[in-house]
């Protein structure tokens, strides 16, 4: 069986922490910004949906193929968001959650902490820079004179940051 590892970055004006993943993904302004994936143990590829790229048909089909195991850290989030994005439920029995696996082994609950505990090299761990970028582009911002009174940071507002 092939494995498709998935990591998405998203935006919604609804607070994930306050309202949960279903309300977050059902918000009218919800979108998937980046779709990162790797087949089996292959290299990671990233699709920049925020910049107009689209999911290849192979990936769209893979999301529903029972012969392909989909994995993610906190798979419920990826599955729910992808279901909203695709307009069709992705079958939960086709997913494996690496966060659950980590907890079963007595490891911490955050991806960052798991990477540290198992001794992943820094370039393979969730980076603090990456976390700051996710917050910048994925969470609504307060309107200020400096930012032109916008409530959201888009890639075109800071192309250099987006390129990281």
Language model feature labels by segment:
Residues 1-30:
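Entry/capping segment at the start of metal-dependent catalytic domains
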Residues 30-32, 36-37, 41-164:
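Active-site-proximal helix-loop-helix substrate-binding element of RNase H-like nuclease domains
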């Amino acid at each position: 069986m092939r494995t498709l590892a998935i990591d998405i970055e998203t935006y919604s004006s609804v607070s994930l922490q306050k309202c949960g993943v279903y309300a977050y993904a059902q918000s009218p302004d919800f979108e998937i910004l980046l779709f990162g994936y790797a087949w089996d143990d292959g290299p990671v590829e990233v699709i920049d949906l925020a910049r107009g790229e689209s999911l290849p048909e192979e990936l769209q089909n893979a999301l529903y193929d029972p012969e392909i195991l989909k994995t993610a850290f906190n798979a419920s989030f990826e599955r729910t968001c992808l279901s909203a994005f695709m307009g069709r439920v992705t079958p939960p029995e086709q997913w494996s959650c690496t966060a659950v696996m980590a907890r079963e082994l007595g490891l911490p609950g955050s991806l960052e902490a798991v990477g540290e505990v198992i001794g992943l090299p820094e370039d393979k761990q969730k980076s603090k820079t990456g976390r700051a970028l996710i917050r910048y582009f994925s969470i609504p911002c307060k309107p200020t004179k400096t930012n032109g009174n916008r409530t959201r940071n888009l890639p075109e507002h800071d192309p250099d940051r987006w390129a990281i």
